[in-house]
């Protein structure tokens, strides 16, 4: 039986993503942090890890991007799940009674209108929305609430005191499955290839690096800049391309790109997720 790790408890959005990515017989392993998931996958403690990588409203999940850049792992699959945020507490609370709201920083960012309305309420970050719900369930402090899912509320015995508190209820988060192997199968018509590159940090270098993709008719579906820690104000670029590196056109484009950048790493190929 394959073992699949994800961050947070059984109530986490990552758990729901892991269930969708691995619907068959598998053992789901709950770990505390994103880095714990990566370490477990790299060490062979689990066969796969599942991590959030992008939100449709807030954008890239920086921690996941940086962890995957440094780890010897490949993205092998992806899926997207709808994210609905609810205000939950141990018992019914009026908004005027709320003193603390716990949630993941991304969830807090997606609920600005609620936080703006609750003037003076202290927002406390948690490692996941599920952990926030767990902390509220275990706390005896009056006036504590969490922004979490209905799944989390049900698991931890909390009550939903306000539904759909997100600024945009149509939010989605994209999750990826990572492993120590790289997929080389490409029987499907559509593929995605994730990669990272560093330019010479001169005028026109970024354009020169990605121009071969446009000339070969390949769609660059994502481009994210991330700072290089040891080089202040310089950046690497994480990207996703519509194509598979074993396809002749994609292979030729990558070969040309390699001659124009300082570093190029392919981070995995996988079918586009639902």
Model-based region annotation:
Residues 1-274:
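Domain-level signature for soluble enzymes in the chorismate/prephenate branch of the shikimate pathway
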């Amino acid at each position: 039986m394959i073992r699949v790790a994800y961050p947070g408890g059984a109530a986490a959005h990552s758990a729901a993503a892991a269930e969708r990515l691995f619907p068959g017989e598998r053992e789901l392993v709950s770990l505390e942090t994103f880095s714990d998931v990566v370490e477990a996958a790299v060490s062979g403690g689990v066969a796969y890890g599942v991590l959030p990588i992008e939100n449709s409203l807030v954008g890239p999940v920086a921690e996941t991007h940086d962890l995957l850049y440094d780890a010897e792992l490949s993205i092998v699959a992806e899926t997207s799940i709808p994210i609905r945020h609810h205000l939950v507490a141990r018992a019914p609370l009026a908004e005027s009674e709320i003193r603390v709201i716990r949630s993941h920083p991304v969830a807090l960012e997606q609920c600005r209108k609620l936080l703006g309305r609750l003037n003076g309420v202290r927002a406390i970050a948690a490692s996941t929305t599920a952990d926030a719900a767990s902390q509220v369930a275990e706390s005896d402090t009056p006036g504590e609430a969490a922004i979490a899912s209905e799944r989390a509320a049900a698991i931890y015995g909390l009550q939903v005191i306000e539904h759909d508190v997100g600024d945009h209820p149509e939010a989605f988060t994209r999750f990826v499955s990572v492993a120590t192997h790289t997929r080389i199968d490409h029987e499907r018509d559509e593929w995605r290839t994730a990669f990272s590159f560093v330019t010479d940090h001169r005028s026109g270098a970024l354009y020169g690096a990605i121009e071969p993709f446009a000339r070969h008719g390949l769609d660059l579906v994502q481009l994210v800049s991330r700072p290089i820690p040891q080089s202040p104000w310089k950046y690497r670029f994480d990207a996703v391309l519509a194509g598979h590196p074993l396809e002749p056109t994609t292979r030729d484009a990558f070969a040309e790109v390699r001659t124009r950048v300082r570093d190029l790493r392919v981070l995995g190929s996988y079918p586009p997720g639902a």
